[in-house]
Structure formats: C-alpha cells, structure tokens
C-alpha cells in the first residue's frame, strides 16, 4: 500500500512539473533531483543566483498548492 501511495505521489509531482515552462522544470530537476547548487544552476542558465532562488521558491510554493489540491497535504 505504501508503494502504491509513493507511486501516486510521484505521478502527482510529475504532473505538476509538466505544467512548468521547460527552463523552470530543468532548474527544479537540477536542484532537487541532481542536487546541483544554486550557483551552478545560475551559471548554466545565465541567471543570477537570486533569480534561481526566487524561481525555486515559487515552484516549491506551486508544488505545495498542487499537492494540497491533490489531497496530499492539509
């Protein structure tokens, strides 16, 4: 049962990530999947570290809202 819930949560996260513009999705994945630093991501995308941090913060907020709507958080 836990494996089923984990798979469903993974699908919900993927569904959220699919709504993001490609660049933002790549930034999110590089930070939270591959563990790249904000500094390295900023260099790779020709952005400031602050711009990357702001985008990540907004995406985390969007993910939180999405997961609440899906019933994963209250």
Where are these regions (language model features)?
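DNA-recognition helix of helix-turn-helix
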Residues: 13, 24, 38-39, 43-69
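ABC transporter NBD signature
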Residues: 21
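A short pre-motif secondary-structure segment
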Residues: 27-31
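Flexible coil/turn residues that form the inter-helical turn or adjacent wing/linker of helix-turn-helix
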Residues: 34-35
């Amino acid at each position: 049962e836990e494996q089923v819930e984990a798979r469903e949560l993974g699908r919900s996260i993927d569904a959220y990530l699919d709504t993001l513009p490609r660049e933002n999705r790549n930034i999110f994945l590089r930070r939270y999947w591959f563990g790249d630093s904000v500094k390295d991501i900023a260099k790779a995308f020709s952005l400031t570290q602050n711009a990357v941090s702001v985008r990540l913060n907004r995406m985390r907020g969007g993910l939180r809202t999405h997961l609440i709507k899906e019933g994963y958080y209250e």
